[in-house]
């Protein structure tokens, strides 16, 4: 697995732990149940994507493998969000939806920090 992917997974787990600690401190089930579990599911599904990509490269039918993986991930998302709406209500559902954006947030931060470092390097070379 690529080092950047490992770093994204590590940062995602750290973000999940921060969300859990924050949820426990404020004693809010929206945060510690909805967002934390959403963060974990997001991290797990990103790991599934990485594993499927590696095995699709070695497989004879990568299209079928990736489509079924895609459907599995969205079924996991749908079941999780459906359970939240049905049993815990709309606010916890929104917290879970925000938690599912954990990987996307960490990838965004990685891209922004990389761009910031490039700009900083260009500015320092101008001096």
From Swiss-Prot:
Regions that span the bilayer: 5-25, 30-50, 81-101
One GO cellular component, as annotated: plasma membrane
Keyword Magnesium: no
InterPro entries xrefs: ATP_synth_I (IPR005598)
Membrane topology, record value: Multi-pass membrane protein
Subcellular location: Cell membrane
Any Gene Ontology biological process: sodium ion transport
Keyword Transport: yes
Major localization class: membrane
UniProt KW keywords: Cell membrane, CF(0), Hydrogen ion transport, Ion transport, Membrane, Sodium, Sodium transport, Transmembrane, Transmembrane helix, Transport
The protein's role, per its UniProt record: A possible function for this protein is to guide the assembly of the membrane sector of the ATPase enzyme complex.
Assigned protein family: Belongs to the bacterial AtpI family.
Remaining remarks: The ATPase of P.modestum is of special interest because it uses sodium ions instead of protons as the physiological coupling ion.
Designated name of the protein: ATP synthase protein I, sodium ion specific
Encoding gene, per UniProt annotation: atpI
